[in-house]
Amino acid sequence: MVSTYLIYFMLMSFIGYLYECLAMIIWTGKWDNRGFLYGPVIPIYGGCALAGTLFFTYVIKDFTPLSVFLIAVVFSAVVEYLVHYYLEKAFHAYWWDYSKSPLNINGRICLPASLGFGLAGLVIIYLINPYLLPVIEKIPQLLRDIISLIMVFIFTADLTLTLCVLSTFISRVENLENRINEHMDEIIGSVTDESKGINSYFYSAFDKLENSGRKYIYRPFGIFSGYARGILSRVKGFRGKSAAKLNMVLNRVKNRITR
């Protein structure tokens, strides 16, 4: 059963990714890669779907559509808020923002989205699970175990690289700020030297800054630069005391990280 639920988790994470991307096409008219990871999966969907499936299979076996809907609304809201809070505290970043949506709480959750997840819960329990789970269980046990192990390996590798990219990006931006301060000290010290023109020092210092920043920020990930750009492109923005700086660099990195 473990392999069955692992495969189910990954498939529902993929379905959640498709749902998010299609929803963005409907709302904005353009494709937008969604999710925290580089791969086409959104684990929060797979996790909630799996938790709901286990809950209504082993905890509450006699349930009604109304109870499924209400539990899905509350559970998804709690999970979405906690995940958003954790990611924001861990990386000072956010991947979705409901601040412009009605009845939102700190931009992390909103009533319309939670109601939508409630409807999704009904679709999963009554329409998807009765067909998807039996199909997975029909796969021979050995093959099912192999597939689940491959999926876990790919998922773990993606998660590890994603965490490394985000941590490296934030660290390098903070280090670059120190370099900027060093160059500003150089400029301030230089203008007191009357033997040379002030403009030449400004140009010299900022040339060094541009070369240093380009090398330090735009090419930090080697052969994984394309992978890193894909991860960073999904970050919607940063919050906190360094938000302005991080958002400025993020916008430039999205377009120039491979240059």
Where are each of the predicted segments found?
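Aromatic-rich, lipid-facing transmembrane alpha helices and their immediate juxtamembrane interface loops
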Residues: M1-R259
